[in-house]
Each structure stands twice: as C-alpha cells, then as structure tokens.
From Swiss-Prot:
Pathway: Purine metabolism; AMP biosynthesis via de novo pathway; AMP from IMP: step 1/2
Source organism of this protein record: Streptomyces griseus subsp. griseus (strain JCM 4626 / CBS 651.72 / NBRC 13350 / KCC S-0626 / ISP 5235)
Name the record gives this protein: Adenylosuccinate synthetase
Positions annotated to bind GTP: 12-18, 40-42, 304, 330-332, 412-414
Residues annotated to bind substrate: 298-304
Keyword Coiled coil carried by entry: no
Residues of the signal peptide: none
GO biological process: 'de novo' AMP biosynthetic process; IMP metabolic process
Domain of life: Bacteria
C-alpha cells in the first residue's frame, strides 16, 4: 500500500485540509512533517466546521492515527488548546503521536518573532508572529528545545539558560526590551509536560514499520511550495520545507518509500503576506474572488490577496516536488464569470518567459500574459462526476491540467467533504 505526500502547490491556503480529510478515512496514519501553528486549515464534516492550526487533519477520522513529526515546531499551549477544543466537541484525540525530536516554541521565540517584525517596519516579511522562524533558527543553531527535553528538567534548564544568555543581550541592546528570566521559562514549559507525555513516541520507527507492514501513510504539508525556504519566493517564505523532500526529513522516512506526491491546486491563486504575486488583482474581480471564496486566513485572520490561475507556478510545483497528481480545489468559486483569464507565461523586460524565473528580481518585475478561457454560469456544487460539469468547466480543468504538467485526479466543487469529484483514485 502507498505512502503519499500531499502538499500545497501555490502559496498555501489551497484547501489541503479538505483533501487530507477526504483521504483520512482511507489511510492509517496522517503525518504533519513541517511548520507549526502558522499553518491553518479548515475541514467541514457534515454541518460542523473545524479550524486546525497544528494538529493533522486526520485527527477527525476515527480510524486514523495522527502524527506530529520531528520536523514540526510545537507550541505546547496551542497543542493542548486544540486538543481540548476537539475533545469538547466529541472528537477522540487519544491516538495522537508526537515525535520526541520535534522542537518546542518557547515564550522567548514568540517575543523575538514579534519584536523583530516590528523592528523591520516596511521591510517586514509578513510573519504570523507565532515564533516559528526563531524556533527553526534555534534548531539550526543547535540551541533549540525539543519535546523530549520536557522530561529531563536539568537538561531543560541548561538549554534555556544557554539560549537566553544571547537572546537577552539582543532583547536589551537592540530592541530595548526587558530580559527574560530563565527560571520563568522553565516553569512555563514544565507545566505542559505531563499532559503531553502520553502522546510522545518514536514516530520515525512507528511510521517506517507501518509502511513496511503495508499500512497507508499520508504526509501532510503545511503552507505551500512557493513558501518553501529553499524553493519559494525568498525571503517572503516560511522557515521550513513544505515541498515533498521535507516529508522525508521531517518524518524520518526515506524517499524510496514515497509512492505518490499530490499537489493541491486552487482554481485561481491567493497569497497572504508580502512578496511578489504576478496575477494579483486590485479590482472588482479580485474582490469578488475574495468574497465568494471566503478568502480570509484561518491562522492570521487577514484577507488573502487574490488573482487568476498562474500556470508557470503550477509547472514549477510539479517540477520541484515530482508531483504525480493534482487535486484542484474551489472550482465552484469561478462560476458566473463570462471569461476566466489564465496566466500562461510572463513578460519580463519585454521578453516572453514561459517558466518561473529563478532570479528574484525578474520575478518581482514579471507581468502576466493571459489566455482567456470561456466561463460558465451553471451551479456545479452537486456534480458527482467529471461529465456532470458544464462543458466550459470541463474545458477549463483540461486546460489547467495540460498547462500544469500532471493529471488532475480530483476536483473540489464546494466546501463540504462530499462536494468532490474523484477522477482517479489516489489509493
């Protein structure tokens, strides 16, 4: 049975939660492999809507074991708050597994994230201010706090004291902030230890054994390809690797065990925060996409920037992730447009460029070259098969598939779990 990676093919917010939850009923494990509570996904089950930030979407599927891998950064307060909220709504969270090697977001990580962003002023990145970047920086600098450190108080104290020696200098001398007491941080972190302990496990061993036994394992990426720290629109990116390679390092599973890589692709394009966005709309079409699509960030609460579909971005995602399939979402949002522009290439310095430019300056100056496709007015939310879609909607999907470089195997035609057309099975 397969091990699948499911990830965002644009700038995040593509509808990964729905796709993951749809597959979650058929898989044995759903694994978050990077990011933290800077991700946000909304899952609709029946008449219930669940907004998750840290927990894998699969936690809503009774037969599935949700896993937080070693590549995730965990805010313990957010973790316990999400678990409590789900428990109150009758969701069984007892099967959750958390890697002991996952890093913890500390109070000083959050403080540094916020003061640094304010310090940058107009040059700010658009961080969520939740301590994600500073926690990953601590990890790379080898001064990070891991989940397993909660269960050795002396090691926790040593690590926090060592980290704060430098950070307090930074807070006081650069940001004019008061020093943070190491003892208070240790006390804050230890209060979560006993509640988290039942979930802590050797997740790398468990996942590899599960794959070897023929179980179905789904790796769920947060954010999106264009927010990847290596492959995204740097520096306007996240601090981890949402791309397919991150699933291997962030969960401890070798690349030869991955059998399928599915890219979630919105039928138009959105972005939250600063950074280049060639197809962004500043007119009534952009406002209509935002309103009809409900384009407001689950995590940030900020309105998303909206624009038309960008084919060079989709091809880029196919290339850097080795995508085998696309799951196209929010096709229903485009109902009602007489014509739908699709970006097929860019104009940069007077020249036509077919692919995403590797040079950030070129990408900042890229102007979209559009091809207009005919729209449709029929309601598509009740469509169950591809042939149920209006002819122009079918043609739109086929055009996107041809431009993007991988087959579109499923289509979202509404927010609900059942409002999906499956063309090719992912399993």
């Amino acid at each position: 049975m397969p091990a699948l990676v499911l990830l965002g093919a644009q700038w995040g917010d593509e509808g990964k939660g729905k796709a993951t939850d749809l597959l979650g009923g058929s898989v044995d494990y759903v694994v978050r492999y990077q990011g933290g509570n800077n991700a946000g996904h909304t899952v609709v089950v029946g008449d219930q809507k669940y907004a998750l930030h840290l927990l894998p979407s699969g936690i809503l599927s009774p037969g599935c074991t949700p896993v937080i891998g070693n590549g995730v950064v965990v805010d313990p307060a957010v973790l316990l708050s999400e678990l409590s909220g789900l428990n109150e709504r009758g969701v069984d969270t007892s099967k959750l597994l958390i890697s002991g090697n996952a890093h913890l977001i500390t109070p000083y990580n959050v403080t540094l994230d916020k003061v640094t962003e304010r310090f940058l002023g107009k040059r700010k990145i658009g961080t969520t201010g939740r301590g994600i970047g500073p926690t990953y920086a601590d990890k790379i600098n080898r001064v990070g706090i891991r989940v397993q450190d909660l269960y050795d108080e002396s090691i926790l104290e040593q690590k926090v004291e060592a980290a704060l020696e430098q950070k307090n200098q930074l807070l006081a001398k650069v940001f004019n902030r008061r020093a943070i007491e190491a003892g208070k941080v240790v006390e804050d972190m230890l209060q979560y230890a006993e509640q988290i302990k039942p979930f802590v496990a050797d997740t790398t061993l468990i996942l590899n054994d599960a794959i070897d036994e023929g179980k179905v394992v789904l790796f769920e990426g947060g954010q999106g390809t264009l927010l990847d720290v290596d492959h995204g629109t740097y520096p306007f990116v996240t601090s981890s690797n949402p791309t397919a390679g991150g699933a291997c390092t962030g969960a401890g599973v070798g690349p030869t065990k991955i059998s399928r890589v599915i890219g979630i692709l919105k039928a138009y394009t959105t972005r939250v925060g600063a950074g280049p966005f060639p197809t962004e709309l500043h007119d009534e079409d952009g406002e209509a996409l935002r309103r009809i699509g409900g384009e407001r960030g689950v995590t940030t609460g900020r309105d998303r920037r909206c624009g038309w579909f960008d084919a060079p971005i989709a091809r880029y995602a196919t290339r850097v992730n080795g995508l085998t399939d696309f799951f196209l979402t929010k096709l229903d949002v485009l109902t009602g447009w007489e014509r739908i522009p699709v970006c097929v290439a860019y104009e940069i310095d007077g020249k036509r460029v077919e692919e995403l430019p590797y040079n950030q300056t070129d990408f900042h100056h890229a102007k979209p070259i559009y091809e207009n496709l005919p729209g449709w007015s029929e309601d598509i939310t009740k469509a169950k098969t591809f042939s149920d879609l209006p002819k122009n909607a079918q043609a739109y999907v086929k055009a996107l598939e041809e431009m993007s470089g991988a087959p579109i195997s499923a289509i979202g035609v509404g927010p609900g779990r059942t409002e999906t057309i499956e063309i090719n099975s992912f399993l």
